C-alpha cells in the first residue's frame, strides 16, 4: 500500500469510527449483519422529500398535510401570504422545497441548518437529507442516508429497498450534491 492509499484508508477509518457512535438505530431495534434494519417508504407521486424525512425518522411521521401546514407556517413567519409563494414551497404534485422540509422538521422537534449543509454538529445527527438536482427521472429528487445496525444505508424512495454503502461511497456522495444533516433535539 502506497502512502496516499494509507492516508486514504486512515481517513476512511476515522470517518467510520466517528459516525458509529453518532447515528443510532431506531428505538427498540437491535439488529446485526446486512439485514435491512428499519422502515423505508417507497415513492408515491413526487413526495420524495417527505419520504426521505420519514426514512430518516424511521416511520410515517410526516404527512402531506403536515408538509402543507409547515409551508404555510413558514410563509407566515417570513411575512408572506399563501398565494403563489406557497406553490414555490409545495408544488401541487408533492415536490417540496428545502424551506418546507426544514419547517416540518422543526414542527417534529428536529432541525436542519440551511446555512451549513452537512457541516453541522454530527453528534446530534439523525441522518442526512440530500438534494439531487437531476435524477434518473430528469427532475429534482431527495434521498436520505442513515447509519444503523453497524452499517451506512442509502434510502432512496425510488428504489425498492435500502442500499448498504461503504464510508467511502458516503463521503463521495455527500460531496457531490447539497446535503443537510438532520439534527436530533438537544437534550439538557
Give the location of each predicted region.
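Amphipathic alpha-helical interface elements that mediate macromolecular binding in regulatory proteins
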Residues: 46, 50-54, 99, 103, ...
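Short hydrophobic/aromatic-rich beta-strand segments that constitute the beta-sheet cores
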Residues: 130, 152-155
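Active-site nucleophile-adjacent alpha helix/oxyanion-hole segment immediately C-terminal to the catalytic cysteine
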Residues: 2-91
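Eukaryotic basic, amphipathic alpha-helical target segments in cytosolic regions
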Residues: 56, 60-61, 109-113, 136, ...
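Conserved beta-strand elements of beta-rich interaction domains across eukaryotes
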Residues: 45, 55, 134-135, 149-150, ...
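Conserved active-site-adjacent core of cysteine acyl-enzyme catalytic domains
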Residues: 78-135, 146-148
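Noncatalytic regulatory segments and standalone regulatory/sensor domains
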Residues: 154-188
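Short, surface-exposed coil-to-beta transition loops
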Residues: 137-142
Amino acid at each position: 500500500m502506497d502512502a496516499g492509499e494509507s492516508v486514504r484508508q486512515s481517513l476512511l477509518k476515522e470517518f467510520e469510527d466517528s459516525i458509529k457512535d453518532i447515528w443510532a438505530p431506531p428505538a427498540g431495534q437491535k439488529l446485526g449483519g446486512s439485514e435491512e434494519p428499519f422502515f423505508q417508504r417507497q415513492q408515491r407521486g413526487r413526495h420524495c422529500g417527505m419520504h426521505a424525512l420519514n426514512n430518516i425518522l424511521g416511520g410515517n411521521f410526516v404527512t402531506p398535510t403536515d408538509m402543507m401546514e409547515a409551508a404555510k407556517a413558514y410563509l407566515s413567519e417570513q411575512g408572506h401570504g399563501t398565494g403563489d409563494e406557497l406553490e414555490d414551497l409545495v408544488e401541487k404534485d408533492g415536490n417540496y422545497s428545502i424551506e418546507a422540509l426544514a419547517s416540518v422538521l422543526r414542527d417534529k422537534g428536529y432541525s436542519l441548518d440551511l446555512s451549513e449543509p452537512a457541516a453541522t454538529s454530527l453528534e446530534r445527527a439523525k441522518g442526512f437529507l440530500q438534494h439531487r438536482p437531476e435524477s434518473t427521472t430528469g427532475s429534482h429528487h431527495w434521498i436520505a442516508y442513515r447509519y444503523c445496525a453497524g452499517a451506512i444505508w442509502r434510502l432512496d424512495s425510488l428504489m425498492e429497498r435500502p442500499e448498504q454503502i461503504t464510508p467511502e461511497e458516503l463521503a463521495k456522495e455527500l460531496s457531490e450534491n447539497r446535503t443537510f444533516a438532520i439534527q436530533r433535539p438537544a437534550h439538557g
